[in-house]
């Protein structure tokens, strides 16, 4: 269908978030978990879908401002792209497994608009180096990497709900400073292995091939933890 966000789906999610916001401090939910597996907006409902995305983002900000953490869990075959990727980035914390991918423009979209020379969507290794879960986790684009079982996601969510940062100006300022420093250190890198090598990650060319257990022993880049999330 080209995505999962249309008028009806967007309205349902928006209603869920507003109900959580209105229940803050009155016995409502203590957290909101979004299980995202989406390419973004349904192409058949482009305008309605884009409007739904913007309203959902606004609602997430309201829920977080009310003191309720919003967690994104990404691990399906579609990942979280387009508006779904932006929604993911707005959450308090993000949990991914090896098959999860998070990005704004999907590989096919980039290839269609810029050509295969710019981005080959069929190059699986390239796609995972750019927007795959391991790249996102090491660089701070996500907050927790799990092995992929339901129980793994559940345990990670329970921990992260308790450590979600407040949604306030100092948090956003600290996050902007972190991103500025990341751009300064790695802005001239052309591929993920260059970033890992510069950051001191051992054998960066093998990141995609090692087991989850081995990957989880790797030290993240200093300053990778998100302040805004």
Residue ranges and their predicted role:
Residues 10, 29-30, 78, 130:
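Generic hydrophobic-segment detector
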Residues 12-43:
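A structural preference for short, pocket-lining loop segments at secondary-structure junctions
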Residues 22, 37, 120-123, 143, ...:
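Acidic-enriched, low-complexity/disordered segments with a strong bias for Aspartate over Glutamate
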Residues 40-171:
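Conserved catalytic cores of soluble enzyme domains
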Residues 158-229:
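Intrinsically disordered, low-complexity segments enriched in small/flexible residues
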Residues 1-11:
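STAS-typified acidic loop motif
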Residues 9-16, 52, 87:
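Hydrophobic alpha-helical membrane-association signature
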């Amino acid at each position: 269908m080209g995505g999962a966000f249309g008028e009806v789906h967007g309205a349902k999610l928006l209603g869920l978030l507003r109900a959580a916001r209105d229940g803050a401090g009155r016995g409502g939910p203590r957290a909101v978990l979004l299980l995202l597996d989406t390419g973004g907006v349904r192409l058949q409902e482009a305008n309605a879908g884009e409007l739904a995305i913007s309203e959902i983002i606004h609602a997430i900000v309201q829920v977080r401002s009310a003191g309720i953490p919003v967690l994104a869990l990404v691990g399906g075959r579609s990942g979280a792209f387009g508006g779904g990727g932006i929604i993911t980035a707005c959450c308090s914390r993000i949990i991914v497994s090896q098959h999860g991918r998070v990005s704004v423009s999907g590989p096919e979209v980039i290839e269609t608009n810029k050509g295969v020379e710019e981005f080959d969507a069929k190059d699986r290794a390239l796609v995972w180096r750019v927007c795959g879960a391991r790249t996102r986790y090491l660089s701070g684009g996500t907050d927790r990497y799990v092995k992929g079982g339901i129980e793994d996601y559940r345990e990670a969510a329970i921990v992260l709900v308790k450590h979600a940062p407040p949604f306030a100006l100092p948090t956003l300022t600290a996050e902007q400073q972190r991103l500025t420093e990341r751009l300064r250190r790695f802005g001239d890198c052309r591929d993920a292995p260059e970033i890992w090598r510069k950051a001191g990650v051992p054998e960066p060319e093998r990141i995609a091939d090692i087991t989850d257990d081995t990957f989880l022993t790797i030290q993240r880049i200093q300053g990778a933890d998100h302040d805004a999330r």
